[in-house]
Amino acid sequence: LDMGHMVNAIEQVDEFLDLGANAIEFDVDFDDDGVAKYTHHGIPCDCGRLCTKYAVLTEYLDYVRQVTTPGDPKFRKELVLLALDLKLQRISSEKAYAAGVDVATKLLDHYWMRGWNGGRAYILLNIPLVEDYEFIRAFKDTLRKEGHEQYNAKVGINFTGNEDLDEIREVLEKLGEDEHIWQADGITSCFPRGTERLKKALEKRDTPGYKYISKVYAWTLVRSSIMRRSLRLGVDGVMSNYPDRVVKVLKEKEFSDKFRLATYADNPWEKFTPI
């Protein structure tokens, strides 16, 4: 996956897809009651980026639905995954359940259209800290209560706070979640980051029978050299401010026969087995 980072304004969606992204990440900002209002990051944010771009979340979901609905004039076949960077760390953990209900409901109403020609992209729920795990419970409860559990097939989970991998596994066990799990590792592009935890995550992913990591991505990469480093380690995805650089690196001789950009025919929840 070549994931565009911080794609918060509606006009940025096509901008990032034009640069070669096949997935986009956007920030979901909540009010104090856990109601998801805007796609907005705010200050401070990644180096060299404007932090203040935003959209009303429901309008954003309406737009990306069109972009991911075959037959729609706005349809772009390359967009296969939407990563929701849920800014739960800005609200109290007690509101994580309410937030999960709200996000699930908004996806049902504005993205999936409750089964009436909704968008087809996979959804990755990026949760900053394990303490906010109630969000996942609420999200799944809501799909069940609303009679739309079929969308679980499209939804994955990812804890993004670089916490201890075994702690993350314990929380997933507690939730009864052992599939559709991504593991991100990274830091804002302003700072360098070593590969120790990334390697551990990849090791777990590649352990036969280990269910709690099926895919790993590194974020937020801007330098081609760091993209190469991550690809050599065998990541499943890269989140970048410059998706066109990722495309370029993937075309290099060293990588072109090992990697390709994922398409909708690929399953984002299955462990990748090299040929």
UniProtKB/Swiss-Prot annotation:
EC number assigned by the record: 4.6.1.-
Gene Ontology molecular function terms on file: lyase activity; metal ion binding; phosphoric diester hydrolase activity; toxin activity
GO-annotated cellular components: extracellular region
InterPro entries: PLC-like_Pdiesterase_TIM-brl
S-S bridge residues: C45-C51, C47-C190
Subcellular location: Secreted
Cofactor(s) named in the record: Mg(2+)
Protein name: Dermonecrotic toxin SpeSicTox-betaIIA2iii
Source organism: Sicarius peruensis
